[in-house]
Swiss-Prot record:
It comes from Streptococcus thermophilus (strain ATCC BAA-250 / LMG 18311). Keywords: Chaperone, Cytoplasm, DNA replication, Metal-binding, Repeat, Stress response, Zinc, Zinc-finger. Zn(2+) 1 binds at C146, C149, C203, C206. The gene is dnaJ. GO terms for biological process: chaperone cofactor-dependent protein refolding; DNA replication; protein refolding; response to heat. The lineage of its organism: Bacteria, Bacillati, Bacillota, Bacilli, Lactobacillales. Pfam families: DnaJ, DnaJ_C, DnaJ_CXXCXGXG. Its cofactor is Zn(2+). This is Chaperone protein DnaJ. A zinc finger (CR-type) spans 133-215. Disulfide bonds: none annotated.
Length: 377
């Protein structure tokens, strides 16, 4: 049977080497990866490329595909599918089938591309930056593909070889004696640590890991209206992938520093305004600070402490709605702690006019008088 579709997807002939297959995949994944290419159909194209690579990069799957097509690569190889207890082109040996009933299952191709790890970075914002938005430069260290060996882990001029212990599978079978008899299970290969490949002559830059630490700087736009705990995802700014896989993502976690004037809940900003009892009784026009600048607000005569006024549109923007929140101003009437004689007389006259003739000012003792004198010095 002439099965060439997977080779065609990678632009290769059927006699392509593993290095050619890997290079073709890396080239095409950079072109069609959905984090890079936003055109319609790019994601579907990338999935087709990945499917072809996962099959052709595995020697057993490739042999099954060449003989039986896609069904053979997935374990259904037609007349030769069962093969025998020593393994065939489709299913593995009897022990592999048996182990699948006990959690073994099919093993993943150790050389298949895998996305890199995600990273997290916490950024601190001032109260105002969170309200209006900001642009921040973030500096951090991450694992990137080693430039010396292009991620292979091998010294330039050499290549990794198929692991002699697991024969490229990344796992080995281990026999264990149980009350039910001898059981066989699969464990990660202790030589290649699951990669399926051995590096005889490692790269001196990355010491065989295929990756190296590098300082990285990225600019992130903080949208207006963010709050503590919210995250911004920067695709592809995490750590390098494995076997040609894409980079992971960077998650920027927001932390908003408190304000010495305001508090906030969502798009609503809160402010406490201190006024005198004279202003509360007679009314006044006062200046109130907001994040948008000072505004004038009318205090009606007879305002009680705890009264809340709403300043429309003076809050924070709603993160997804786009409209502006409000600022709520709560009045707090401040009682004076020091009065001169004229002020006391005026208040006593006010009390008498109000019918509160029983009001008797507290007389200060000697020590309180001394304290007042010292405070005035």
């Amino acid at each position: 049977m002439n099965n060439t579709e997977y080779y065609d997807r990678l632009g290769l002939s059927k006699d392509a080497s593993q290095d050619e297959i890997k290079r073709a995949y890396r080239k095409l994944s950079k072109k069609y990866h959905p984090d890079i290419n936003k055109e319609p159909g790019a994601e579907e194209k990338y999935k087709e490329i990945l499917e072809a690579y996962e099959t052709l990069s595995d020697a057993q799957k490739r042999a099954a595909y060449d003989q039986y097509g896609p069904d053979g690569a997935n374990g259904f190889g037609g007349q030769g599918s069962f093969g025998g207890f020593d393994g065939g082109a489709g299913f593995g040996g009897f022990e592999d089938i048996f182990s699948s009933f006990f959690g073994g299952g099919a093993t993943r191709n150790p050389n298949a591309p895998r996305q890199g790890d995600d990273l997290q970075y916490r950024v601190n914002l001032s109260f105002e930056e969170a309200v209006f938005g900001a642009e921040k430069e973030i500096h951090y260290n991450r694992e990137v593909t080693c430039k010396t060996c292009s991620g292979s882990g091998a010294k330039p001029g050499t290549s990794p070889v198929t692991c002699g212990r697991c024969h490229g599978h990344g796992v080995i079978n281990v026999d264990t004696q149980t009350p039910l008899g001898m059981m066989r299970r699969q464990v990660t290969c202790d030589v290649c640590h699951g990669t399926g490949q051995e590096i005889k002559d490692p790269c001196q830059t990355c010491h065989g890991t295929g990756r190296e630490k590098q300082s990285h700087t990225v600019s992130v736009k903080i949208p207006a209206g963010v709050e503590t705990g919210q995250q911004i995802r920067l695709a592809g700014q995490g750590e390098a992938g494995f076997n040609g896989g894409p980079y992971g993502d960077l998650f920027v976690v927001i932390n908003v520093n408190p304000s010495d004037k305001f508090t906030r809940d969502g798009s609503t900003i809160y402010y406490t305004l201190n006024i005198s009892f004279v202003q509360a009784a007679l009314g006044d026009t006062v200046e109130v600070p907001t994040v948008h600048g000072n505004v004038e607000m009318v205090i009606p005569a007879g305002t009680q402490t705890g009264k809340t006024f709403r300043l429309k549109g003076k809050g924070a923007p709603r993160l997804r709605g786009g409209s502006q929140g409000d600022q709520l101003v709560t009045v707090k009437i401040v009682t004076p702690t020091k009065l001169n004689d004229a002020q006391k007389e005026a208040l006593l006259a006010f009390a008498k006019a109000s019918g509160d003739e029983k009001v008797a000012p507290q007389k200060k003792g000697f020590f309180n008088k001394v304290k007042d004198v010292l405070e005035d010095l």
